Amino acid sequence: LAIPPFNYPVNLAVSKLAPALMAGNTVVLKPPSQGVVAGIHMIKCFQAAGLPAGTVNLVTGKGSEIGDFLTTHPAVNCISFTGGDTGIAISRKAGMVPLQMELGGKDACIVCSDADLDLAATHIIKGGFSYSGQRCTAVKVVLVMQDIADELVRKVHAGVQKLKVGRPEDNADITAVVSEGSANFIQGLVEDAKAKGATFLTDWKREGNLLWPVLLDNVTADMRIAWEEPFGP
């Protein structure tokens, strides 16, 4: 059973399918609810390429409705899942079935005193805000030596201010997050940080699912944003 995420619905699906097929298995692909069309077209490509019928099988639907049925089905003898907290629920219900999971994280960038700060700032911005931050490997926190912190903050802030916010078809750097639920979750993290005294280097702005990039300083360990994965800009 292969369950890829919405942000790379083809790339991460293939990375699950290929090893399984090479090892002689048949596979059930359950594409993400927000990436079903990509999964359907990929299966059509496999069929057009001559892959035997039944080798890769597609099941669509909301994970909340069909997830338990799939992950606990007796015919499933391995589960490969990429995502967030859902992986915990799958692992609890799957029993002794082998699991391969890539879940959430809080990826840090560490900047030492002798670093090239222009280079560091460039990669922090690229790592934090590409795909509007909707990547499991996105930079989510920067740990920097005190003696260079203020200068690095200025450089990162200047770069963030240049990011274009808007629609993908307009080549914007920051586009809408995947769902209203995701936007609401991110807003909750931001509001918690504000209530607990974080320094906002950018203004908080939201229009529907479109969130302007947020840059925070003086984040403390009691803030949710210090520990939870925002999966957004």
Swiss-Prot record:
Catalytic activity field: D-glyceraldehyde 3-phosphate + NADP(+) + H2O = (2R)-3-phosphoglycerate + NADPH + 2 H(+)
Catalytic residues as annotated in Swiss-Prot or TrEMBL: 102, 136
Subcellular location: Cytoplasm
Superkingdom of origin organism: Eukaryota
Protein name (Swiss-Prot/TrEMBL): NADP-dependent glyceraldehyde-3-phosphate dehydrogenase
Gene source species: Scenedesmus vacuolatus
Binding site for substrate: 7-8, 135-137
Site feature location: Transition state stabilizer: 7
Binding-site list for NAD(+): 83-87
Induction: Induced by sugar addition.
Family matches, as Gene3D superfamilies: Aldehyde Dehydrogenase, Chain A, domain 1 (3.40.605.10), Aldehyde Dehydrogenase, Chain A, domain 2 (3.40.309.10)
Residues involved in NADP(+) binding: 30, 33, 180, 229
One term under GO cellular component: cytoplasm
EC number of this enzyme: 1.2.1.9
